[in-house]
Design a protein with these regions (language model features):
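Acidic catalytic motifs of isoprenoid enzymes
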Residues: 2-165
């Protein structure tokens, strides 16, 4: 299980990859954007102990989606940088990026499996290569990389993930 490591700013803190840092929007902008979507409605009815973790997952998913949909430059390389940051996070590495610091905390507290976060990144990689799915099964396979991991991560936040679900 990852730990937060040293506080940001200490000598042993390693900065995150420059490409991912450029693609990582400020948390305030992500939270502002969330207010214009359906996501925040649930936050008002949920116990406070879940809100921070859900907002963190939203911020990560939103960042990955924004890279896949709108980032300038080589989007696949930017997505590779996100995967590298996940590698660092799960290895117990330290970052100065507030989004990854919050994600490290949520990963540790909620015991989030890396593969679910990576599947979100993989869905956006696929978005760069596939623009139309030929069959319904192909579309379902894509959903297993996008919608499914979000649901699994949310279930983990609530400690409700199980084989039956």
């Amino acid at each position: 299980m990852p730990t937060l490591g040293s506080p940001a700013g200490r000598d042993e803190a390693r900065p995150m990859h420059a490409e991912a840092a450029q693609a990582s929007p400020p948390l305030e902008r992500l939270h502002s954007r969330a207010r214009h979507e359906n996501f925040p409605v649930a936050l008002h009815v949920l116990p406070a102990r879940y809100r921070r973790h859900l907002l963190t997952l939203y911020a990560f998913a939103r960042m990955v989606d924004d890279i896949g949909d709108a980032a300038s430059g080589d989007r696949l390389s930017l997505l590779d940088s996100v995967s590298a940051e996940l590698d660092r996070l799960y290895a117990g590495g330290v970052t100065t990026d507030p989004l990854y610091q919050r994600l490290a905390y949520t990963v540790a507290v909620c015991d989030l499996p890396r593969n679910q976060l990576e599947r979100l990144v993989e869905a956006n990689r696929r978005d760069q290569l596939v623009h139309r799915y030929r069959t319904f099964d192909d579309l379902l396979d894509y959903c297993s990389l996008s919608a499914d991991p979000v649901g699994r991560l949310v279930l983990r936040v609530f400690d409700a993930d199980s084989a039956e679900r």
